[in-house]
């Protein structure tokens, strides 16, 4: 006999919890199913914990819109709930005159997304960060950092206070739309029937979608796993802001981020791997970090970088093998399965966008 429930959210990362919160605060009955032993153990626990301002994302994209909306919501939420965070700011730096044009392009693009940046010449940037080497920089005052675990605790508390439930060790075996409801079979044989199901399973979202009977596989993108390695600094860094090199074709470059204790870490790089469980950091990869970091911090000492941790970006690709660069929020209007919303490719800025994503999904299923 199936147990009836209004809404099921599969995945208790920061986005799944934000979706569950948005639904619960609207009076919906919510059950969150998490395969792991607790919430937020994968992508949500292995990132830079940066609150992004929204500089780089294509204008009109979900990433651009939800990042800007989510950033405002996140700062307000953290202040209201006393969640540790800091609006420390970020400098995007050009380390050669040839990069000035690229830096100007970043400034213009950010402005198109509604994000104002301050142009700094060498001396102005050095006045903010004396150890920095650059020819020019952009100052993003609205970039910050957040304690992602404390954030998820707050979101979960909101869900539970509104009557929602988190069930851990609850992997989903398959789903099917039948008898005017989404039927969910857990690995332990539990059978649930739900009006609304949100697939917020992160790295596992495409695989879960393929186990959803009645959902045409043409709607499921191909996952690929982009590992990002981080190296931590032995000792204190002489910086109080995040430092990012000017973006190049290969990505955002090896950037310096800080945690709330002031500890510096560098990364992430990009390493394509076959499995999302490949989380060991190869110390040899650190050698490539030194040359990149010294472009903007010549004072980095030999031997100062230590292997930190790694995360996996949930990249997705279309049937032709082209990268899908925007968030995919796929509701019944896209795939035709009533009551089902799939979230694919929720990589950065997923943490920043989480509260806005929750609101967006709640509106789709209203």
Where are the regions that the model predicts?
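N-terminal Rossmann-like FAD-binding beta1-loop-alpha1 element of flavoenzymes
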Residues: 5-32
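Active-site substrate-recognition segment that forms the wall
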Residues: 22, 51, 83-86, 191, ...
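Glycine-rich FAD pyrophosphate-binding loop
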Residues: 25-46
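C-terminal lid/capping helical subdomain adjacent to the catalytic/cofactor pocket in oxidative enzymes
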Residues: 45, 323-366
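Dinucleotide-binding Rossmann-like beta1-alpha1 core, especially the glycine-rich loop
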Residues: 49-124, 134, 253-254
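Glycine-rich phosphate/pyrophosphate-binding beta-alpha loops
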Residues: 56, 143-145, 248-251, 340-354
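Short beta-strand to alpha-helix junction loop
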Residues: 58, 62-69, 93-102, 139-157, ...
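Helical element adjacent to the flavin cofactor pocket in flavoenzyme catalytic cores
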Residues: 138-196, 355
